[in-house]
Each structure stands twice: as structure tokens, then as C-alpha cells.
Amino acid sequence: LHVGLLEYVPFIILLLALFTISGGVRLTGALVGTPIVNLAIILIGTFLASWMGTTGAAMLLIRPLINANKHRKNIVHIIVFFIFLVANIGGSLTPLGDPPLFLGFLKGVDFFWTTTAMFVPMLIMIIALSIIFYFLDSYYLKKESIKVETPQDKLKLGIEGVFNLGLIVGVIGAVLISGFWKPHISFEVYSGVHLELQNLTRDILLLILTYISWTYTPQQIRKDNEYTWFPIIEVAKLFAGIFVTIIPAIAILKAGTNGALAGIINAVSSDDGPVNIMYFWYTGVLSSFLDNAPTYLVFFNTAGGDPITLMGELKNTLLAISAGAVFMGANTYIGNAPNFMVKSIAESSGVEMPSFFGYLFKWSIPFLVPLFIIVSWIFFA
């Protein structure tokens, strides 16, 4: 019940708000999915992700990206790199970007600490993946032998449902309220389960914003977006299972050196202090298969849990934990919430996405792991 009311329900409410509001925004005009246009959309989303959340940026731009590539036969690689960059790595610069960083902010990490600390590792990942994507997309386009023609209608680019962008700002504000406002008022909804006022306020505001978007956005916009409830329902079902099954796994990790995973906890420390490269890899690998937010917290506390120390003399340790949690959320569909939502939206639009293990072994391991090795060698070795 504790996990359900205090973690799962707020999580789904946030996803519902972003999914509904972003579904009311439609990019109109003659946008054709060439390699440079696709890369531009992905990079715009990557930039936005740190400020409106990976989920918000992904939900805002996935449909325009798919629509721009309706003429293409093979766009799986486009969706995959969108997941890599927009749904994960792009959220590195602020606590608004990704849930693990927001938890760090609630624990006392400065709001802009990640902006400076994560900038260079993130930039390396973005530049490398952008170059790879451009040549890969160019290769697939050439292989398809499709002549990309400029549309005849010459319709200028525009945005329908623009008021929803204001609602997304409202979502960001509601999330920030729960982080900054501490009235120290809570309601006991069940024995030992307390709902804090700031979190209740956030969730109510998110539901109000969702209602406003659904009620006042012309339904034709959603129809043109091929909007359905299927992706959010599928994600709600999947993450219900994940939230239940991670409870024992996180409990074992929290047991530290006294638990069944004592080997992992021991591996990240030595007589000389934290072993940063191990913090990066263990946080990352576990974040790929568990929820990356509680995994971040476990290793944050393992490293001492003092934000002042972790931002000071142990700044590379905090960087390793942060980068591992955010970057490696891209390794699997369940590593970060928007991954599976993007997959579901793509599939509902007719794109044949790879299976769980197909994504892992064909895409994330070949393209991401070599870059993670380089990043870990540069910053944490």
C-alpha cells in the first residue's frame, strides 16, 4: 500500500498528465523526415528534456517525428535513437529532467549542480550518438531508394493546440511545488502510510491540468495525432508489476553488506574510499532493470548520503551515480518510463519495434555500451 499510494499512483498521474497534454499538441506543415530533419527534432527534444522532463519532451515530439517519416519504410532506428537521447540522456542537466536527479534534489543536492557536473559527459554522449545517427539514417534512406520530395502544399510549419504548452509549464510548476514547499502537514490514509500535503497538492494540480487539456483541446487535433489511451494503459499495467517486484530487490540492496547483494555494495568501496567506476556501472546496470530512482537513492546513501560531502570532495562519486542512473536508463524499455511509452506510441502508429531483448542486444549494447566504457574511462577510471 505504501508503494502504491506514495510512489506508483503519483508516478502514473504524472505520466497521464504529460501524455494527455502533449497529445493535444500537433506540429503542422511540410515536415519531411530527412536525416538532418530527424536529427534536428531529436536534438530539440534532447535540449527540452532537462527542462520539461524526459517524459514531457518525448511525448511532445514522438508523434511529429513519426508523422515526418510516414514515407519511410524503416524507422525503427529513428525511434530507438529518440529513446536514447530524448527519453534518457537529454534529462541530465536538472532535477526536472529525470526522477533520480529529482530525488537527489529532494535530498539536498543543489538544483544546478547537475547542470555543471553532468554537462561534459552528456555532451560527449550527445555528439557521439548524433554522428552515429546521422550516418545510420543516411544509410537506411539510401538503402530504401526513396526520393525525398518537398511537399506540394507548401504549408508553413505551425503548432495546433498551443495552449497545451502552457499546461506543460504548469506540470513543471506542480512538480517543483512538491520539491520546494514543505508545510510539514500529512494525512494518515492507512496505518503507517502518510500522504504529505505538498505531494497531494501536486497530484491534484496534475489531474486538473489533465482535465483542462482533455476538455478544451479540439478533439480533431487528437484525431490527427492518432491519439489513443492504449499506450498509457499499457504502461500503467507494466509498471504496476515493476513497482511490486522491485520492492524485495530494493530491500535487499538497502540491507547493504548484510544483504544477499553484499558483493555489490562491497565492490563500490575500498580502503581508499569510493570506487567511482564501479558506482557508475552498478548504478547503471541495476537502473536498466529496476526503477532507476530508488536505485539512485540506494547508492546515494551507500556513498554516505550527505549532499554537502557528495557535492564537494566526493563530487565524482555523485557524478558516477547520477550518470549511471540517467544514461543507462536507455539500456532497456523499462529503464525509464518514457521508453516504454515511446515504444507503445510507435507500435500504435504501425512501427514494428524490437522485442525487449531485441532492443537490448541489437541496439543498446552495440551503440551505448562502447560509449559508456569511454565515459567511464574518461571520468571515473
What is each residue range found by the language model?
Residues 1-10, 111-121, 153-159, 184-204, ...:
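Interfacial loop-to-helix junctions that mark the boundaries of transmembrane helices
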Residues 1-3, 18-33, 47-60, 248-260, ...:
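Transmembrane alpha-helix boundary signature
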Residues 22-29, 44-57, 86-94, 121-133, ...:
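Helix-loop-helix module between adjacent transmembrane segments
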Residues 93, 112-159, 327-381:
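Juxtamembrane and boundary regions of transmembrane helices in multi-pass small-molecule transporters
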Residues 49, 59-74, 78-80, 86, ...:
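Membrane-interfacial helix-loop connectors
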Residues 15-23, 45, 122-134, 164-179, ...:
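Hydrophobic core segments of alpha-helical transmembrane domains in multi-pass membrane transport
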Residues 20-24, 56, 60, 98-101, ...:
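Juxtamembrane interface elements at the cytosolic ends of transmembrane helices
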Residues 168-298:
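Transmembrane helical segments that form the transport core of multi-pass membrane transport proteins
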